[in-house]
């Protein structure tokens, strides 16, 4: 499953590029909330493996990781005669839960899922958290727009 997110990246995951359901946190990307991270997620024997897609030092229109990853998704759709679903989750979803929801959709409906995961579970007193998440959702529009 292809994962696109503007969540903050955990330190260990950033350096190794290999992680699990804790690879991304519950806050906005600290570098830039409109900057997406791209990863591939696979659930094997009940365990998540999340692999960060590294960017080349010199990005050009010919070597964009997002383009290459989406081309892989489209090829899998063609090869396996599957449809593709771009899934954006709702409010109050930790990263692990968004992975689970995307995975269930993918397996239940035999689809290729591209998951956009945004920090919708920032914590705190419920009313204040809701207001904060509303601001985060507005801020995330640039990130989701760039993923399209």
Give a label for each model feature.
Residues 1-114, 123-128, 132-135, 139, ...:
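Flexible, membrane-associating and regulatory peripheral segments of lipid-active enzymes
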């Amino acid at each position: 499953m292809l994962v696109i997110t503007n969540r903050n990246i955990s330190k260990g995951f950033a350096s190794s590029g290999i992680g699990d359901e804790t690879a991304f946190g519950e806050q906005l990307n600290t570098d830039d909330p409109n900057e997406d991270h791209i990863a591939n997620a696979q659930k094997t024997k009940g365990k998540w493996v999340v692999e960060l897609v590294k960017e080349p030092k010199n990005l050009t229109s010919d070597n964009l990781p997002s383009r290459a990853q989406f081309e892989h998704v489209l090829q899998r759709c063609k090869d396996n005669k599957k449809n593709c679903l771009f899934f954006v989750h709702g409010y109050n979803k930790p990263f692990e839960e968004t992975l689970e929801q995307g995975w269930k959709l993918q397996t239940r409906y035999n689809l290729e899922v591209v998951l956009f995961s945004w920090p919708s579970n920032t914590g705190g007193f419920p009313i204040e958290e809701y207001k904060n998440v509303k601001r985060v959702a507005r801020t995330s529009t640039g990130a989701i727009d760039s993923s399209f």
